[in-house]
Structures are given as C-alpha cells and as structure tokens.
Amino acid sequence: MLNSGDILDEKYEVIKILGKGGMGTVYLCKNIILGNFWAIKEVIRNTKNIDILAEANIIKGLNHPGIRRIVNVFYVNNNVYMVQDYVDGQTLKEFVEANGRMQIEKICRITSDLCDIVGYLHNQNPAIIYRDIKPSNIMITTGEKIVLIDFGISKIYKNDAVVDTVCACSNGYAAPEQYGAGKSCTQTDIYGIGMLIYFMLKGRPPFTGIEPLLEENYETYINENLKIVIKKCVKIDIKDRYTSVKALHKEILKILKKDKSQISVQGKVKKTVKGVLGFIGAILAYIYILHWNKKESTVMNTIDRTEIVVPIEVH
C-alpha cells in the first residue's frame, strides 16, 4: 500500500486513498510538474489477475463523458498503475448514506444518465458488459453529473460462451447468472440497474435478490410505476427482464415526465389555494374595516345626541 507523499513514475505525488476494492486501490495523486490531479489505480499482479490490463484495454477505446479516460499505464516493481481522470464529487453510496432515500425525480434523473452510459457500452461492437453496477461505483460530480467508475470486472460479450469463466460480482446487486450458473449479457446490467433503483428508493441495499420482487417490501407511498420497473429489471429469468437498456430508459423517461407533470399540477394547486386564501383574507379584512367604521360612527352619533349637563353652583 502506498502512503501520502510517495512519488510514482517520478511525477505523481500520492495525496490520499480514494477507494479500495477487490481489483485494486485507487489513489488521488497530484502531478508535481503540472499541478493537476489524477485518480491512479494500483493493481497488484498475482495469479488471479490473468489479464492485468483488461480494464485498460476496455476503456482505452471509449469516449463518453460518463466514463473516465485512462491516459497512461506504467509499472512499478510488480504492480501496474493506471492513470485516470479524477472525478470531484461523491459516490451514490455516500450521497444516500448522508441524505437518506431519494425523491422520484432525482432517482429517475440518475437512472436516466446511467442508462445513457450503459447503453453506450452495450452499443459497442462487440458489446461491453459492465457487470458491477452498485452505489459505490456511481459518482455524482459537483456539477450533478453521473460518472461510472471501476471497470475491473467488465468484459467483452462473447456469443460463443456458455457460462462466465470467472465468477465475479458484488453481493446484493449481482444477477443470478453472475454466480457461475450462466453467461453475463446486457440483461445482467439491467438487473444491476434495477437493484440500484431499489437502493435509491429505500435508502438501503436489498438484503437478498428476492426482496425487490415482493410487494410487501414496498411502502404505500412508493411510486407504482417505479415498482413495476424494478420488478421487471430484477426478474430471475433473463428473458423476463427488459430486452435492452434503451427499453428501460424509455420507461424511466415516462415516469420522469409524469412526475414532473404531477409536481407542476401540485404547484399550480398550491398557488391557486394560496391566491384563494389571500382573496378570502382580503374580503374578511374589508368586512372588518366596514364593521369597525360602522361601530365608530354609531358611537360618535350617540355622543352627539347625548345631553351634557354642567352643574351650576348656587351661592
């Protein structure tokens, strides 16, 4: 493990650890020559890492604002280091832990952005299967943009493969086929997106893969359309899930549009109610003033009609 102040490749100063996972450790580093910051991933070579450059080889040909670039790769001793764009922000996991469950509109916006990124991966030829969609791999930038990080277990889709050669997944978000019983495909990522939506909706990860499928695990206030989307995403059988991320994205946009319309209507209703209450208040104030003036006039008339008796002293 590297320490703060260590120098890599004669120009990168280690500032701190950004994250640590099964495939390596990511450090925030500063280029001591140019002064800019980078995220550098350290992967230790061992017998498990058959293709230590698999992640770099997948990312190098990609060009999407929601995917970090790899700008350099170098070796130190027995380790490989990948220099990537540094994303200033926080993970979705950190955001939810700090703020709790999210509103429908924000859930849909994050999911929509994620669908755009994952859809881009699936549209590559051959398709790239991300396989590790989870809150800690989703970055929310300071500009409210979504960035997908850590392609450590991503793979190129192979038509001729029957099952995954290596079981690689994150418990709670991985599809059934990732546990060695089948082959990862585009629907594998759709499953992960469904679990991610459930996480944002509940404010906590699912305890089991079955949990989001059961109606009893949803509170009455939860959006019905979003429940339908989640349940379709996380079906056990691949054939029962959405056929593509594009189809899922379309449903999310429908929910977002409907939610915005409801918010707009609610806003108009509140504005109307506020206006009516203001009008009623004005009328009541007017009636009060009339009543007060009438009362005051009555008092004055009484005074005018009252005989004033002045006592006279008799000497």
Predicted features, each with a name:
Residues 110-111:
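Activation segment signature within eukaryotic-like protein kinase domains
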Residues 172-257:
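C-terminal lobe helix-coil module of Hanks-type protein kinase domains
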